[in-house]
Each structure stands twice: as structure tokens, then as C-alpha cells.
Amino acid sequence: MADMSLTIITPERTVLRDAPADAVVVPVVDGSMGILKNHAPMVANLRIGVLRYKQDGVYKRVAVTGGFVEVSENRITVLADAAELAESIDVMRAMEAKRRAEARLRDRKANIDRTRAEAALRRAMVRLRAAGALDHDKD
């Protein structure tokens, strides 16, 4: 039986609603933070990364791209800019996005917005890590 519930909401949709969780690991701006039962109430900024939550002894992954996490009374609420469950990620599409971003960054002659290209590459890498197509321990 799970001790906590996890809800993940984006501006477009609710990704998870009251999903049972025994543990949650969120990517915050200064690293990763683990959340267990009876965690102190808090709010933290999220960074682009892989959120992991333990359900029935198995960790599940969600790609998140910034936002906030709130913990209160064994309820974890994530308000993310974007979020995608690992099983919903189109790996081929994410690989293509990674390839395009890398090509843009390699092209020294192109007049590109490096910040946007680097952000696109980070998003693609996180999606691939969440889907298990890349080493997800490097998040």
C-alpha cells in the first residue's frame, strides 16, 4: 500500500492524478530530491529532468521540463511546464529531435539561437532517458 499520492499537472492536461507512490525523486535546481512518507511541507523549483516514483516496488519515470513541486500531508503535486510518462514517449521522435538539435549546435555558420538549441537538446535527452533509451542515471 502506497503511503503518498502524486499528481502531475501541465498547462495542457493532468498527466497523473493521485497516483499511489511509496517514494518520489524529483529533479530540482540544485540536484535531485527524494520524498518519502511524512516529508516536511515544502515547495521547490523543478529543472528539466526525469522524475521517478516508486509504485508497487517498481520505479516509474516521467520526463519533466521545469515548474514546481509542492509537498504537503503526503501529497506531492507537480506543476510542470511539460511532462510526459515514459510509456507515452515516442522514442524515434525524441531521437530525431536530439539529432536536429545536435546538428544545429554543430553548424558554426548558421545564425541560430544557441540557448534555444541547447534547451531543445536537453529536452530530447531527458525524454530519451525517461523512456529508457539513454542512461537515465545521469540525470
UniProtKB/Swiss-Prot annotation:
Compartments reported by the entry: Cell membrane
Keyword presence, DNA repair: no
InterPro entries from the UniProt entry: ATP_F1_dsu/esu_C_sf, ATP_synth_F1_dsu/esu, ATP_synth_F1_dsu/esu_N, ATP_synth_F1_esu_C, ATPsynth_dsu/esu_N
Membrane topology listed for this record: Peripheral membrane protein
Signal peptide: none
Keyword annotations from UniProtKB, A to Z: ATP synthesis, Cell membrane, CF(1), Hydrogen ion transport, Ion transport, Membrane, Transport
GO MF term list: ATP binding; proton-transporting ATP synthase activity, rotational mechanism
Gene Ontology cellular component list: plasma membrane; proton-transporting ATP synthase complex
Principal subcellular localization: membrane
Disulfide cysteine pairs (residue numbers): none
SUPFAM superfamilies referenced in this protein's UniProt entry, alphabetically: Epsilon subunit of F1F0-ATP synthase C-terminal domain, Epsilon subunit of F1F0-ATP synthase N-terminal domain
Nucleus keyword on record: no
UniProt function note: Produces ATP from ADP in the presence of a proton gradient across the membrane.
Protein family: Belongs to the ATPase epsilon chain family.
The protein's assembly and partners: F-type ATPases have 2 components, CF(1) - the catalytic core - and CF(0) - the membrane proton channel. CF(1) has five subunits: alpha(3), beta(3), gamma(1), delta(1), epsilon(1). CF(0) has three main subunits: a, b and c.
HAMAP family membership: ATP_synth_epsil_bac
NCBIfam families named among the record's database cross-references: ATP_synt_epsi, PRK00571.1-3, PRK13446.1
The name this protein goes by in its record: ATP synthase epsilon chain
